[in-house]
UniProtKB/Swiss-Prot annotation:
Pathway: Amino-acid biosynthesis; L-leucine biosynthesis; L-leucine from 3-methyl-2-oxobutanoate: step 2/4
Organism: Saccharolobus solfataricus (strain ATCC 35092 / DSM 1617 / JCM 11322 / P2) (Sulfolobus solfataricus)
Enzyme superclass (EC): lyase
Function, as annotated: Catalyzes the isomerization between 2-isopropylmalate and 3-isopropylmalate, via the formation of 2-isopropylmaleate.
Reactions this protein catalyses: (2R,3S)-3-isopropylmalate = (2S)-2-isopropylmalate
Name listed for the protein in its UniProt record: 3-isopropylmalate dehydratase small subunit
Pfam short name (any one): Aconitase_C
Family the UniProt entry places it in: Belongs to the LeuD family. LeuD type 2 subfamily.
The organism's place on the tree of life at top rank: Archaea
């Protein structure tokens, strides 16, 4: 699974309240949520992301309250993947379960510049930035299968169909 696109960078400790503020949690429409993703840091983020972007961030991306809407809003906004030095565990699982690739890369914000164009091999974790190849942690096994299906619900539907035949 190869993903590519331009980079938008954020720092450390981007919590779920920044990704999608609590006042929007009563809404369920992914496209509505997308309009408010990262709003506290950049009210125009959703316009930039709509072209298809890769977020590069620092440590503990997605920390804070367990909020599935964070992954849903990012994906709906046009975020193709998130590369970070580390992730909050619950965000990591929510991202995979919603079909949003998340790649762990040491020193991510030092290695990749804003507006760089990156190409990511999700399975191996290799990230091509210009002529440089960076080695992140890839996604394999069932997590990769869930991503390839488009998320946990699509994966379960697929498995149900396979088991019926």
């Amino acid at each position: 699974m190869i993903i590519e696109g331009p980079v938008i960078k954020f720092g450390d400790k981007i919590d779920t309240d920044i990704i999608i503020p609590a006042r929007y949690l009563k809404y369920t429409d992914p496209q509505y949520l997308a309009q408010h993703v990262m709003e506290p840091l950049d009210p125009e983020f959703y316009k930039k992301a709509s072209k298809g972007v890769i977020i590069v961030a620092g440590k503990v991306f997605g920390m804070g309250s367990s909020r599935e809407q964070a992954a849903i809003a990012l994906k709906a906004a046009g975020v193709k993947a998130v590369v970070a030095e580390s992730f909050a565990r619950i965000f990591y699982r929510n991202a995979i379960n919603n079909g949003l690739p998340v790649i762990t890369l040491p020193n991510s914000t030092k290695e990749i510049d804003e507006n760089s164009y990156v190409k990511i091999d999700v399975e191996t974790g290799e990230i091509l930035v210009g002529n440089k190849v960076l080695k992140g942690k890839g996604i394999t096994g069932m997590a990769l299968e869930i991503l390839q299906a488009g998320g946990i619900m699509e994966y379960l539907k697929k498995m149900q169909t396979v088991n019926r035949n």
